[in-house]
């Protein structure tokens, strides 16, 4: 079986602060917990919460657990650290040869 390759390439990384631009959680901000490459989705902290009913097991109690559900990357944008608004990402080569991600709005470097 051939491996499914995503149609979307993402410049988002774990730990980036993003804002939701579409859907039921539009306007909410949070940090990326996980990037799901094959699904072209991200898990964002405290955004798109769902309830899961779990059975009791040896190491955990049963009950209703709230957890984050994936959001498609087309529905989130990175937050510009300089302005606090949603922005696109550009890539830039620095003098020392490193490739870094740059906020398109302000030109602020996103990589540390």
Curated annotation (Swiss-Prot):
Q: Name one GO biological process term.
A: translation
Q: Where is the signal peptide?
A: none
What GO terms fall under cellular component here? Answer: ribonucleoprotein complex; ribosome
UniProt GO molecular function: rRNA binding; structural constituent of ribosome
Q: Which InterPro entries does the entry mention?
A: KOW (IPR005824), Rib_uL2_dom2 (IPR014722), Ribosomal_uL24 (IPR003256), Ribosomal_uL24_CS (IPR005825), Ribosomal_uL24_KOW (IPR041988), Translation_prot_SH3-like_sf (IPR008991)
Asked if NAD is a keyword of the record, the answer is: no
Entry's SMART domains?
KOW
Any Pfam family matching the protein:
ribosomal_L24
Classification via PROSITE patterns: RIBOSOMAL_L24
The UniProt keyword set, sorted, is: Ribonucleoprotein, Ribosomal protein, RNA-binding, rRNA-binding
Family membership noted in the UniProt record: Belongs to the universal ribosomal protein uL24 family.
User: Subunit structure of this entry?
Assistant: Part of the 50S ribosomal subunit.
Q: What does this protein do?
A: One of two assembly initiator proteins, it binds directly to the 5'-end of the 23S rRNA, where it nucleates assembly of the 50S subunit. One of the proteins that surrounds the polypeptide exit tunnel on the outside of the subunit.
Name of protein? Large ribosomal subunit protein uL24
What is the organism of origin for this protein?
A: Magnetococcus marinus (strain ATCC BAA-1437 / JCM 17883 / MC-1)
């Amino acid at each position: 079986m051939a491996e499914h390759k995503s149609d979307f390439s993402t410049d988002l990384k774990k730990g980036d602060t993003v804002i939701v631009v579409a859907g039921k959680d539009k306007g909410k901000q949070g940090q990326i917990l996980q990037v799901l490459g094959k699904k072209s989705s991200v898990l964002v902290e405290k955004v798109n919460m769902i309830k899961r009913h779990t059975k009791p097991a040896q190491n955990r109690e049963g009950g209703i657990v709230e957890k984050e559900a994936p959001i498609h990357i087309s529905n989130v944008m990175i937050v510009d650290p300089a302005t606090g608004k949603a922005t696109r990402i550009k890539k830039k080569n620095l003098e020392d040869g490193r490739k870094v991600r740059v906020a398109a709005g302000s030109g602020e470097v996103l990589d540390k």
